[in-house]
Amino acid sequence: MATSALGAVLLTGCSLGDFGDINKNPNRPSEAQTDMFFTYACTYTYDFTLNSYYYNPWTQMFNGYVAERNTLQYGKMNILEFDTSSYYLYPLKNLKYIIDLNSDDATKNTVAVTRFGSNKNQIATAVTLQAYFYMHLTDILGPIPVKEALQAGEDNYTPAFDSVEDIYSYLDEKLKEAYALFDESGSLSSADIIFGGDVSKWKKLNASLRMLMAIKLSDVAESVGKSRFAAAYADGGIVDDGDSMIYRFDSNSPSPLYSNGVNYNSNFCPNEYIVEALKDYGDPRLFCYFSLVPFRGSAPVGDASDPAAYVGMKLGIPNVSDYAEKVCYFSESLSAAEGLLPIITAARVNLVAAEAAERGWISADAQSLYEAGVKASFEQWGAEDVDVYLASDKVAYAGTKAQKLEKIAMQRWLSGYMADGVEAWSDIRRLHVPVIEVGRPAVGITHIPYRMKYSGAIAASNKKNYESAVSAAFAGTNDAEHRIWWDVK
């Protein structure tokens, strides 16, 4: 696997720059300061936008957002092992400490605990963020330990793997319990680097996570998905851009895209799929997502107002270097020192709700939700002329039910650029919009991976339960050809 400064910082969850006390690992019970536990856990939240621990930007590559500029290494899509140990060891364990310390009579009223917020709000927020991590990990791999996870203190070092179906059910219940605990009359301290201590926004994320899971049941357990979605939608998810889950960097702890802008633009570039789709749709977000400026401070290499000047790289072709000087670059706004990385946005949640409405799962107007999702994305990126865009033939909400569902899926993909890559990949696996092809036959594959593979470390450390999970879910073969439980088409 390649190594570089980019690999060490851009895609490494534990090397985010100088966060001061944030980067001091507080993951020891003897340092029982729940605010530190929480902040440290939050530094892992953007891993599913720009994935952690790998130079390989698969969370943006599998979706047709990113390609390689100079070499064909990750475009082959054959580096597919995914390890979960860091997530269990750091964010998930930290969040468990928060729950335990706020539940224990001996600790819950100490200053080290209460300075972060009320016991109920801390527990509710920690459970919500745990569910966020577990949802993504199971959507990446399939069965993982959840119910018996984090029990090393109880001498359970080899937890059983839960099925995706059971995990979704368990997380939905835990999230509902957490939702009921939230007290909006209180707040969390500034140690909450995601929502600035705003409990109402954590409640909206809680309901949104339940919706994101429920919609994936459309092909495997529709009645269950419908019931869960309706309950979550009634509770109220993220519908306004100001409530989106965003990771915010600052000048003291700059965005890794800023710190590594030269390497990033040298090694990776916009994918042809997203560039050409935006041009084909006459989508003004083209000028927000991409740039013709190779490096900070340099002059553009074309007319920035001309859509034809923006060219993306084909995914997985062997001779990428032949096209390196022709393709465009990532937007300067993404690589600013005080840059933002979107995770779960109002655009996504509105468009997920539009799908639910179109399926008849909720009593809401699908077109209104669809248009609200597109408008939220335009607002997020500062794009103009959204009404003209919504009235265009390719975008206007019209046609058969199948055509409307395809339009919803397409707008989710167009708005998902550089946001939660695992969610975008889940959409493509489930809905097949758009169809992402790779540069076959040169790279020897015919489709994007259906899942990541368990790492060798997972197999070695929990062999019996690992083998049982692989046998039950994937016919005994740990590969990328088998599908996650909810992916059946």
Named regions from a protein language model:
Residues S52, S363-A364, S415, V435:
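Residue-level detector of short coil/turn "hinge" positions at structural boundaries
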Residues M1-G13:
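Sec-dependent bacterial lipoprotein signal peptides
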Residues S377-E379, Y389-D393:
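C-terminal beta-barrel architecture of Gram-negative outer-membrane proteins
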Residues T12-C14, S259-G282, L286-F290, P300-D303, ...:
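Long, intrinsically disordered, low-complexity segments
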Residues E31-T34, V66-L129, F133-E384, A398-L405, ...:
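Structured, solvent-exposed acidic/aromatic patches
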Residues C14-N70, N78-E81, L89, Y97, ...:
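Membrane-proximal, proline-rich intrinsically disordered regions
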Residues L50-W58, G142-P145, K226, G421:
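Beta-strand acidic-aromatic groove motif in beta-rich domains, primarily in extracellular
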